[in-house]
Amino acid sequence: MQPIPIVTIVALAVAIIIAIVVWSIVIIEYRKILRQRKIDRLIDRLIERAEDSGNESEGEISALVEMGVEMGHHAPWDVDDL
């Protein structure tokens, strides 16, 4: 084969590999964002119920604990989802 088709095939293979890596990173980050939104919704619902009833909902706390979230200071300005 001549050098031009070989270079073209190699460049195409490299481009495909780069695209797979980039989209894999995008999917991983998207899942992190979705998980964080779910956690934020649970915390907001927990706070709302605590304000309404005066005590916290054990079911939602256990759901947060299963996800590995510690309860404590909920600071909206401490968002690290970039």
From Swiss-Prot:
Family: Belongs to the HIV-1 VPU protein family.
GO BP term, pick one: symbiont-mediated suppression of host type I interferon-mediated signaling pathway
Subunit field text: Homopentamer. Interacts with host CD4 and BRTC; these interactions induce proteasomal degradation of CD4. Interacts with host BST2; this interaction leads to the degradation of host BST2. Interacts with host FBXW11. Interacts with host AP1M1; this interaction plays a role in the mistrafficking and subsequent degradation of host BST2. Interacts with host RANBP2; this interaction allows Vpu to down-regulate host BLM sumoylation.
Chief location: host cell
Additional remarks: HIV-1 lineages are divided in three main groups, M (for Major), O (for Outlier), and N (for New, or Non-M, Non-O). The vast majority of strains found worldwide belong to the group M. Group O seems to be endemic to and largely confined to Cameroon and neighboring countries in West Central Africa, where these viruses represent a small minority of HIV-1 strains. The group N is represented by a limited number of isolates from Cameroonian persons. The group M is further subdivided in 9 clades or subtypes (A to D, F to H, J and K).
Modified residues (Phosphoserine): 53, 57
Pfam hit, one: Vpu
Matching HAMAP family: HIV_VPU (MF_04082)
Protein name: Protein Vpu
Membrane topology summary: Single-pass type I membrane protein
Superkingdom assignment: Viruses
One Gene Ontology term, aspect cellular component: membrane
TM region positions: 8-28
Entry note about domains: The N-terminus and transmembrane domains are required for self-oligomerization and proper virion budding, whereas the cytoplasmic domain is required for CD4 degradation. The cytoplasmic domain is composed of 2 amphipathic alpha helix that form a U-shape.
Key words, A-Z: AIDS, Apoptosis, Host membrane, Host-virus interaction, Inhibition of host innate immune response by virus, Inhibition of host tetherin by virus, Ion channel, Ion transport, Membrane, Phosphoprotein, Transmembrane, Transmembrane helix, Transport, Viral immunoevasion
Regulation: Ion channel activity is inhibited by hexamethylene amiloride in vitro.
Localization (cell): Host membrane
InterPro entries membership: Vpu (IPR008187), Vpu_cyt_dom_sf (IPR009032)
Topological region Extracellular: 1-7
Record PTM: Phosphorylated by host CK2. This phosphorylation is necessary for interaction with human BTRC and degradation of CD4.
Residues exposed to the Cytoplasmic side: 29-82
GO MF assignments: CD4 receptor binding; monoatomic cation channel activity
Purpose of the protein: Enhances virion budding by targeting host CD4 and Tetherin/BST2 to proteasome degradation. Degradation of CD4 prevents any unwanted premature interactions between viral Env and its host receptor CD4 in the endoplasmic reticulum. Degradation of antiretroviral protein Tetherin/BST2 is important for virion budding, as BST2 tethers new viral particles to the host cell membrane. Mechanistically, Vpu bridges either CD4 or BST2 to BTRC, a substrate recognition subunit of the Skp1/Cullin/F-box protein E3 ubiquitin ligase, induces their ubiquitination and subsequent proteasomal degradation.
